[in-house]
A protein has these predicted regions:
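Elongated, amphipathic alpha-helical interaction scaffolds
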Residues: 1-213
Length: 213
């Protein structure tokens, strides 16, 4: 029996963020900007053309800022470390053909790290995670720091954010309908819950294939 894709929340989030219009819309809400041209946004990829979104991450550059977004359905204190790896991997491509040993300063995009949380465990509306929290030896003045902002996007949390950001709001409507039919309607098979006839279910063949895999 096919029990459906247990990672459906991450997979749908990734597909949404692969769309430049969606990614730009979310960026505008989080940063208070009004960019309207999706072509101003550049999706960042790993070597061999493998998009970071395939790994449940979204990474893109807008106006010299590199945003790295990740969805989490469980609490993960290692996000700063993971984002450090993502950021350095992407930056290595930016500077590949530049002389970092020369006298001229090589400019790199401003990093922005965001985690969208929608798990079952109760969490604050917003909070921060720092790379220095993972250091084996605590220091008051870390010489390397990375800060992730976490948004709890479950309904009942961050209402103002969800009202402004229709992409995230509609995504959470879909997730909540799957939860509803999976639990309350006693649909033990996750695939049936995902494909149940709810108003906000995903309809495209590509997304259905992802949900079922």
């Amino acid at each position: 029996m096919n029990n459906g894709n247990r990672e459906y929340k991450s997979d749908v989030f990734s597909m949404l963020m692969e769309d430049k219009v969606n990614a730009l819309s979310v960026y505008n809400v989080l940063n208070g900007t009004n960019y309207t041209n999706p072509n101003d946004l550049e999706i960042c990829t790993l070597d061999k053309g493998v998009s970071l979104t395939i790994r449940n991450d979204a990474a893109f550059v807008v106006d010299a800022s590199l945003s790295i977004y990740e969805h989490q359905s469980t609490v993960c204190p290692n996000m700063p470390v993971r984002n450090l790896v993502y950021y350095t991997t992407i930056i290595s491509k930016f500077i590949k053909n530049k002389n970092i040993y020369g006298r001229s300063l090589v400019k790199i995009p401003v990093p922005k790290f965001v985690v969208f949380y929608n798990g079952d465990e109760d969490q604050p509306e917003e909070y921060y995670m720092k790379l220095s929290d993972a250091f084996e030896k605590k220091t008051d003045k870390p010489e390397l720091e990375l800060v992730c902002k976490v948004y709890n996007i479950n309904f009942g949390k961050n209402k103002q954010l969800l009202d402004k950001c229709t992409v995230i709001k509609h995504y959470m409507i879909f997730v909540d309908y799957v939860r509803l039919y999976h639990k309350e309607q006693e649909l033990e098979d996750l695939e049936r819950a995902i494909n149940y006839n709810v108003p906000y279910k995903v309809d495209t063949t590509r997304e259905r294939d992802c949900l079922k895999c």
